[in-house]
Amino acid sequence: MNKDLTRGPVMRSMLLFAVPMILGNLLQQCYNVADTLIVSWYLGPNALAAVGSSFTLMTFLTSVLLGLCMGSGAVFSIRFGQRDADGLRESARASFVLIAALTVLLNVLAFLCLDGIRLFLRVSDDAIWALMREYLAVIFCGIAGTFLYNYVSCYLRAIGDSISPLIFLAVSALLNIGLDLWF
């Protein structure tokens, strides 16, 4: 479901395009708060400290992936606006391969550098580090999903669809909270 944002009233088109992205950001904040509450209620202060200590690293990795996906999205939107279907397909294919390879590389480096990460993040408590290491291992296993969501979302937004990424995010948030409670 794509929408030609070059037709019709500009303000209306921009608002209709932006509202799902704003709602998506609010939804992400809600499930981050839910994660924090669930961890603190069920796993205790050390687990909460482990998750909190991981935040800087996870923000960095996610920002790198998101930046690459958004840059690709700019190229996609240019190709889409030019009505260059072949160029759009080629851009999508090339950027997917590049970002997927970088995602794998970042993941491998993160796994290999876990002890260095501990020093960099200055986590001195062994109990917190043990929980943090376990948490990061799970997160690193899911980084491919983060890449796929961000990549597909940027592609869809580039062709005018900001609703589908919101739906994907809503389903993901509900699954995340449900799995948090289950495990």
Descriptions of predicted regions:
Residues M1-A18, F76-G142, G178:
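Short alpha-helical transmembrane segments in multi-pass integral membrane proteins
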Residues R7, M11-C30, A34, L57, ...:
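Residue-level signal for short hydrophobic patches within transmembrane helices
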Residues V39-T59, A127-L131:
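Interfacial/gating helices of multi-pass transporter permease domains
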Residues A18, N25, G52-F55, I99, ...:
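Residue-level recognition of transmembrane alpha-helices
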Residues A18, C30-V33, Y42-P45, R79-Q82, ...:
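Helix-loop interface residues and adjacent transmembrane-helix termini in multi-pass membrane transporters
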Residues A110, I163-F183:
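Alpha-helical transmembrane segments of multi-pass membrane transporters
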Residues L48-V108, T146-P165:
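Small-residue-rich hydrophobic transmembrane alpha-helices
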